[in-house]
């Protein structure tokens, strides 16, 4: 599980951190004082299901609308691509693909190749993540947030907008740390 991963990976020796896996869904774990937080029923730390868009948010697999996972998982990125392609007229190499078959990997490949619309999709996704991370920091003050999963391997395409949105939305006491 996530707890086993951190012992061998980036957070070794760190007692307060959050792990986020950006895959088909959004997995997460919160570690405080070296202990994984489970809550009274074992379900604490479902950060993929915090609401990031109220009102007219996307339907999530959990049945609610507006969850982080609906926007920032691999399937969320593919959905953003479909929405951008349907609602906008921008040129994009993604238009050469059958719209319902577009994957987050297709968006990544296009973005790396210079496709502006695909780069905007990463900007949009990273901004949502960064805003959420600012909130996560406010409630647990982690020393770090460790990202895993396919989307995390997108490097600066995803990390730059995450950092910018997070820093912009942090409480003043956390800025620059």
Language-model features and meaning:
Residues 7-15, 36, 54-60, 64-177:
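ATP-binding/phosphotransfer module of carbohydrate and carboxylate kinases, centering on a glycine-rich
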Residues 1-6:
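Short, small-residue-biased leader/transition segments that mark boundaries at the very start
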Residues 22, 40, 55:
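Fold-independent oxyanion-binding glycine-rich loops
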Residues 43-47:
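Structural signature of FAD isoalloxazine-binding scaffolds in flavoprotein oxidoreductases
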Residues 29-33, 37-39, 51-53:
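Short beta-strand-to-turn element immediately C-terminal to the catalytic PLP-Schiff-base lysine
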Residues 19, 49-51:
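Conserved hydrophobic/aromatic beta-strand scaffold that supports enzyme active sites
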Residues 22-24, 33, 150:
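Cofactor-binding loop segments of dinucleotide-utilizing enzymes, especially the Rossmann-like FAD-
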Residues 17-21, 27-29, 59-61:
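Short glycine-aspartate micro-motif
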């Amino acid at each position: 599980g996530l707890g086993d991963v951190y012992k061998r990976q980036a957070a070794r020796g760190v007692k307060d951190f959050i792990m986020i896996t950006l895959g088909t869904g959004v997995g997460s774990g919160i570690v405080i004082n070296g202990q994984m937080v489970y809550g009274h029923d074992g379900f604490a730390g479902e950060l993929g299901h915090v609401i990031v868009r109220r009102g007219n948010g996307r339907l999530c697999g959990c049945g609610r609308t507006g969850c982080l996972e609906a926007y920032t998982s691999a399937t969320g990125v593919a959905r953003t691509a479909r929405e951008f392609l349907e609602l906008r007229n921008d040129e994009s190499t993604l238009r050469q693909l059958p719209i319902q078959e577009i994957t987050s990997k297709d968006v990544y490949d296009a973005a790396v190749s210079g496709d502006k619309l695909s780069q905007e999709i990463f900007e949009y996704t990273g901004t949502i993540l960064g805003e959420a991370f600012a909130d996560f920091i406010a409630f647990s003050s982690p020393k770090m947030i460790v990202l895993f999963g396919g989307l995390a391997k997108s490097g600066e395409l995803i990390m730059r907008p995450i950092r910018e949105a997070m820093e912009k939305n942090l409480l003043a006491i956390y800025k620059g740390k």
